[in-house]
């Protein structure tokens, strides 16, 4: 047992039991980790762990490529993306690939190319994962010290952190370059109902960009979720990319300060817990972003937001009844409030009825009808365009309020289409994953802190069935 290639494979930073503990003649060294411990057996095998990560990346990219081609094969140009159960093509369309005015798909070939490129990439990653998992060195420290590491090496860990930050920064700049130089991105706010355009006037003013972080998360404010123009989004990615790259360089060139060395637990499982916490926060933010934001996630591709569908319903019936002779400026509803229009507590003119709760919605089909004090009555009477009517009628019947069995729509809308909006899927999945990752953070953080404190942790394996089975060999 003691003469294997690397003794370190049997001396883990995190162990299920302390090194001296023996139960029923079994100890950590002879039994290893339980089957349910996943990659824990690779904690100190940097080469094998690299293989696991590369193979995992290959599986992810393979799914992306395969699902991409599946969606292309099933795509029907005559129907909106959000009615077809598509979850990948809306992202490609948002980046400006294959779409024209109004979000109409004019070319599916870029989507096909994307799928094929992902499949080819997954093959490369798959071969790399198999090589490092089965054929490559178990540990990298001896053969390739630059890629090797010891979990307790604080300086090496912050160097790895720095490399990751630089890669994230470069990823942010990829979006910037696409928006500025490589065809532009889809802007739902472009005049006449949205179009692909290059971003020419970036918002780089720090008071604007960081002002979003200082806003309230509640109605009318909306924190960063309230961003509603692409100049701010792309400018924010310039700031984000720059901060990530500069922060990465900082972490590569420096060593952790004394307070950081004392404050953090420096072990593989601790890093896992930190990562899960960060991903959990990202998941919760993304959940709100997808649900409420129709600029980064255009309604032409993802379907309307909930507030947008509700406001669209009020707008559609205002248009109908106005043509039938109703005076939409003065008509009263059953509660005595305005039936079509009313004033908010701050005096702005907003839609009446149950949709009053969504008074702070901003949508490209509605904003042209606003004046300095909310909705403009004269514009509502004279300036409504056919494309606004068509879009609001479409959104009215496609609220993202469906259950998973597709029974959905605004509760008061009898014409609602039974479908599951990709906005619902994206938002719900990110909330659920964000929650699971938070629980994972608590679990692994607790184990890592227990290991650092030197007391017992893990699930008792004394009665684990596999320990009573005949050895396979």
From Swiss-Prot:
Pfam families, per the entry: PSII (PF00421)
Keywords: Acetylation, Chlorophyll, Chloroplast, Chromophore, Manganese, Membrane, Metal-binding, Phosphoprotein, Photosynthesis, Photosystem II, Plastid, Thylakoid, Transmembrane, Transmembrane helix
Propeptide, residue positions: 1-14
Annotated positions of the N-acetylthreonine modification: 15
GO terms (BP aspect): photosynthetic electron transport in photosystem II
Positions that bind [CaMn4O5] cluster: 367
UniProt remark on cofactor binding: Binds multiple chlorophylls and provides some of the ligands for the Ca-4Mn-5O cluster of the oxygen-evolving complex. It may also provide a ligand for a Cl- that is required for oxygen evolution. PSII binds additional chlorophylls, carotenoids and specific lipids.
Positions of transmembrane segments: 69-93, 134-155, 178-200, 255-275, 291-312, 447-471
Primary location class: plastid
Lineage: superkingdom: Eukaryota
Gene3D superfamilies: photosystem ii from thermosynechococcus elongatus
Modified residues (Phosphothreonine): 15
A Gene Ontology term for the protein's cellular component: photosystem II
Its membrane topology: Multi-pass membrane protein
Gene Ontology molecular functions: chlorophyll binding; electron transporter, transferring electrons within the cyclic electron transport pathway of photosynthesis activity; metal ion binding
Record's subcellular location: Plastid, Chloroplast thylakoid membrane
Protein role: One of the components of the core complex of photosystem II (PSII). It binds chlorophyll and helps catalyze the primary light-induced photochemical processes of PSII. PSII is a light-driven water:plastoquinone oxidoreductase, using light energy to abstract electrons from H(2)O, generating O(2) and a proton gradient subsequently used for ATP formation.
Subunit structure: PSII is composed of 1 copy each of membrane proteins PsbA, PsbB, PsbC, PsbD, PsbE, PsbF, PsbH, PsbI, PsbJ, PsbK, PsbL, PsbM, PsbT, PsbX, PsbY, PsbZ, Psb30/Ycf12, at least 3 peripheral proteins of the oxygen-evolving complex and a large number of cofactors. It forms dimeric complexes.
Similarity annotation: Belongs to the PsbB/PsbC family. PsbC subfamily.
Official protein name in the record: Photosystem II CP43 reaction center protein
UniProt source species: Lemna minor
Taxon lineage: Eukaryota, Viridiplantae, Streptophyta, Embryophyta, Tracheophyta
UniProt gene name: psbC
């Amino acid at each position: 047992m003691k003469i294997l290639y690397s003794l370190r494979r049997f001396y883990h930073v995190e162990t299920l039991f302390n090194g001296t503990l023996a139960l029923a003649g079994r100890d950590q060294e002879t039994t290893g980790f339980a089957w349910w411990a996943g990659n824990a057996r690779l904690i100190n095998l940097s080469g094998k762990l690299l293989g696991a990560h590369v193979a995992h990346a290959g599986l992810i990219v393979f799914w992306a490529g395969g699902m991409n081609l599946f969606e292309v094969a099933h795509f029907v140009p005559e129907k909106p993306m959000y009615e077809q159960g598509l979850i990948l093509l809306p992202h490609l369309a948002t980046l400006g690939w294959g779409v024209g005015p109004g979000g109409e798909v004019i070319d599916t070939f870029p989507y096909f190319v994307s799928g094929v490129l992902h499949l080819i990439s997954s093959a490369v990653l798959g071969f790399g994962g198999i090589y490092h998992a089965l054929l490559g060195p178990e540990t990298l420290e001896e053969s390739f010290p630059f890629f090797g590491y010891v979990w307790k090496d604080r300086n090496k860990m912050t160097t790895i952190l720095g490399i990751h930050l630089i890669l994230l920064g470069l990823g942010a700049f990829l979006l910037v370059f696409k928006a500025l130089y490589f065809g532009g991105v889809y802007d739902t706010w472009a005049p006449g109902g949205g179009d692909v355009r290059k971003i020419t006037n970036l918002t780089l003013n720090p008071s604007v960009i960081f002002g979003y972080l200082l806003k309230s998360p509640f109605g009318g404010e909306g924190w960063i979720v309230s961003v509603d123009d692409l100049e701010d989004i792309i400018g924010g990615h310039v700031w984000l990319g720059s901060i990530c790259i500069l922060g990465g360089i900082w972490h590569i060139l420096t060593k952790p300060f004394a307070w950081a060395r004392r404050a953090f637990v420096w072990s593989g499982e601790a890093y896992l817990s930190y990562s899960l916490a960060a991903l959990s926060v990202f998941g919760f933010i993304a959940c709100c972003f997808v649900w409420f934001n129709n600029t980064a996630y255009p309604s032409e591709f993802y379907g309307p937001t909930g507030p947008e569908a509700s406001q669209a319903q009020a707008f559609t019936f205002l248009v109908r009844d106005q043509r039938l002779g109703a005076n939409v400026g003065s008509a009263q509803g059953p509660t005595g409030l305005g039936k079509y229009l009313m004033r908010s507590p701050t005096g702005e003119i907003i839609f009446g009825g149950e949709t009053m709760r969504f008074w702070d919605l901003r949508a490209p089909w509605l904003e042209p009808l606003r004046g300095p004090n909310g909705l403009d009555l004269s514009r509502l009477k004279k300036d409504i365009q056919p494309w606004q009517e068509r879009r609001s009628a479409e959104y009215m019947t496609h609220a993202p309020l469906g259950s998973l069995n597709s029974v959905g729509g605004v509760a008061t809308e009898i014409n609602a289409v039974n479908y599951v909006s990709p906005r619902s899927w994206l938002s719900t999945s990110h909330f659920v994953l964000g929650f699971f990752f938070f629980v994972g953070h608590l679990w692994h953080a607790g184990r890592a802190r227990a290991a650092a404190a030197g007391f017992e942790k893990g699930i008792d394996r004394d009665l684990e069935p596999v320990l009573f089975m005949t050895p396979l060999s």
